[in-house]
Amino acid sequence: MAKQSMKARDVKRVKLAEKFYAKRMELKKIISDANSSDEDRWDAVLKLQSLPRDASPSRQRNRCRQTGRPHGVLRKFGLSRIKVREAAMRGEIPGLKKASW
């Protein structure tokens, strides 16, 4: 199990990313626009740097919904490989069966 503080930190990062999403996209659009002036681009870069670090989506970590484990998380299920295997063996994931060839 992951520490509660680590789980809470990731939840905080998700909320911050949602809050600043529109503003980040607006600034990034100005920065990548070839028609905008150099001054506008520079101002946009400075404003983007002034946003909170945790507002960046790349700072988020995929974690297992049950345990909070940060590694080996399968996106399709939102669970770690260990919990997916346990759930699959109990038949709790519809359509998923053990491979056999």
UniProtKB/Swiss-Prot annotation:
It comes from the Bacteria. Coiled coil: none annotated. GO terms for cellular component: cytoplasm; small ribosomal subunit. The keyword rRNA-binding applies. Keywords: Ribonucleoprotein, Ribosomal protein, RNA-binding, rRNA-binding. One of its GO terms (biological process) is translation. One of its GO terms (molecular function) is rRNA binding. Disulfide bonds: none annotated. InterPro entries: Ribosomal_uS14, Ribosomal_uS14_bac/plastid, Ribosomal_uS14_CS. Gene3D superfamilies: 1.10.287.1480. The keyword RNA-binding applies. Pfam families: Ribosomal_S14. NCBIfam families: PRK08881.1 (NF006477). Binds 16S rRNA, required for the assembly of 30S particles and may also be responsible for determining the conformation of the 16S rRNA at the A site. Belongs to the universal ribosomal protein uS14 family. Part of the 30S ribosomal subunit. Contacts proteins S3 and S10. This is Small ribosomal subunit protein uS14. It comes from Actinobacillus succinogenes (strain ATCC 55618 / DSM 22257 / CCUG 43843 / 130Z). The lineage of its organism: Bacteria, Pseudomonadati, Pseudomonadota, Gammaproteobacteria, Pasteurellales.
